[in-house]
Amino acid sequence: MGFLTDWLTDWLKGLLIEGIMGNLTGLFDTVNTRVGEIAVQVGTTPAAWKAGVFSLIRQLSETVILPIAGLVLTFVATYELIQLIIEKNNLHDLDYWIFFKWIFKTAAAILILSNTFNIVMAVFDVSQSVIASAAGIVQGSTDISSSMIDTLEASLETMSLGALLGLWLQSFLIHVTMWALNIVIFVIVYGRMIEIYLLTSLAPLPVATLSNRELGSMGQNYLKSLFAVGFQGMLILVCVAIYAVLIQGIATGGDPVGAIWGCVGYTVLLCFCLFKTGTIARSIFSAH
């Protein structure tokens, strides 16, 4: 009878350990996968991310928004000419060189407006180049090795049946929680790309105001916003890299319960930091 009890206990312990390791392996595999996915997503240019969406946004920008921006530029250029004329003592001290100055500024504004889409894409090409360079370093240093899982499994084999049952229930709950948090991370990363497309679609309107001293703040703030959203990807990559390194620490700590709850705690922290990356990027570039 004692032999049967011992066999049943060992069988249940093995079953629970297998279930716990299945949940934990899924969690740690998600870390590796998430690092790779985010590195790819934030390191992809708008043109390469979704070609169909990019083509639609470009067509809307060039066929719908650009003509309106042309009207805005006409107003800005006319306003600029009036300001240049009346600022010289109401035409009493009029210098004709100001007309050449106005022609040059207007020509430059037209050139910039007609190449708005190329300028916007150049901003994101610069930011994605920086992100791509950093992604290789991050991806190579944050992978979680299988030896960490083996160390964790060895510590589980020394635990009692009751402790393993409680730990299995906790691991299952945390597995579901991590799945939900991964959806949140997905929304944040993809939401950034949607924001890039939205900014790109209306690009000609603020760019049309750049040539004017008084109205140019709109265009300047728009360019700051472009750089902020572009380099937000770098901050997202840094957050995920820090997260993966922290996960490595708890995976080798030898405390299964602490490893599980530490994993979910760090994931909640990651989601919070990802939400803050947009605010931090805008504050760095002084974008409103």
Q: What is the meaning of each model-derived region?
A:
Residues 1-72:
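Binding/recognition "hotspot" determinant
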Residues 24, 31, 106-202, 236, ...:
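Non-cytosolic segments of integral membrane proteins
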Residues 207-224, 251-253, 282-284:
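Alpha-helical transmembrane segments
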Residues 1, 8, 12-23, 95-112, ...:
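Alpha-helical transmembrane segments and their helix-start/interface "positive-inside/aromatic belt" motifs
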Residues 72-110, 202-216:
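Hydrophobic transmembrane alpha-helix segments characteristic of membrane transport
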Residues 60-64, 95-99, 103, 160, ...:
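Hydrophobic, aromatic-rich alpha-helical transmembrane segments
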Residues 70, 74-86, 236-251:
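Juxtamembrane "helix exit" motif at the C-terminal ends of alpha-helical transmembrane segments
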Residues 60-68, 103-107, 183, 187, ...:
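Loop-to-transmembrane-helix entry motif
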